[in-house]
Amino acid sequence: MVEVLDWFQLASKKESRMIQMRRDMHQHPEPSFEETWTHNYILNQLRKLDCQIEAPIGRNGIKATFIGAEQGPVIAFRADFDALPVQELNDVPYKSKNEGYMHACGHDGHTAILLGVAEIIHEHRHLLKGNVVLIFQYGEEIMPGGSQEMIDDGCLRDVDKIYGTHLWSGYPTGTIYSRPGAIMASPDEFSVTIYGKGGHGAKPHETIDPIVIMAEFILSAQKIISRTIDPVKEAVLTFGMIQAGSSDSVIPDSAFCKGTVRTFDTELQTHIQTKMDKLLQGLALANDITYDMNYVRGYLPVHNHADAYEVVKQAANEMHLRFNESELMMIGEDFSHYLKVRPGAFFLTGCGNKEKGITAPHHNPHFDIDERAFKYAASEFLKILEIEQVL
């Protein structure tokens, strides 16, 4: 006789446990690639369960495998667990205890959800018809990210398909969002230094003013997006920092800027990078300046595989969650590296709640999570295992 399980009911029974684990981790946020406390916390939870543990994978990663009694598919889920250099301003009992650091992007929630899923799988491991691999990843917030290091160290060995989620405060609790194909952009970073000739502010003719030339570069660079790229293609070029000089009457020797480029394909990446360099070459020729440009390509765009996306959609609908097709998002995620080597899909789990005042955006010192979202994400993962015929 086939045992039929109510995944939402099982996830709901784990709600208080997932909330407690999230709050434990929320009080101990750690920067990317330095997640020692969190690494050990996750290991301590997993050691209570009947699973094979491999650690460290890469630097601080953990791989937990639940092995079924029967042969079948090998499905992986991933959660990240690093925090951000943000000073938390929430007045809550589980506020960060680490000065200057905060779980301001929900990674504590991601990990708590996956640990809750692990406990449910452990309790029903006699039903497994394949293997379930849980990947706990460090260092998502800072390039080059932890995913590629974990892949290189074998975290996807024998895995057939991989899924992941990101809690999202911009969507209400009880919703699941995803889309086939591209869903998240490649987040490139660049910096430019223009070297002119400093001098007295009253005698600009005796100088080569790098501030004016930098201003010309910044304004002209915007035309790369608006005038050289097909308007139906998504691309963003943003300058986030400009730095030059220290006095009102001194023209400095140099000016510096930093920014980001967001695209969904490598051709656009190359086009924008090339155009920026050509623009600087022209300014150098016209103004007798020199320059340095450092352009760093970020994570690959996140591209969901069509069949895995359909599984996410089916799971949400069968669980009576409110499924919606996501908009294209210009944020970056190193989950993309898993999807380059294995089929799979990434989805967003709504965790916003206007009535509770949980509306702050990610990376904000007031960011928080409607913790009721945990049971929705956990039940979605479990339903995916059922559809994939692992549970």
Task: Say what each PLM segment does.
Residues 28-33, 84, 141-142, 246-248, ...:
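Short, small-residue-enriched loops and turns at beta-alpha junctions
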Residues 62-63, 84-86, 91-102, 108-109, ...:
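Histidine/acidic-residue-rich, glycine-tolerant segments that coordinate divalent metal ions
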Residues 215-391:
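Metal-dependent amide/peptide-bond hydrolase catalytic core
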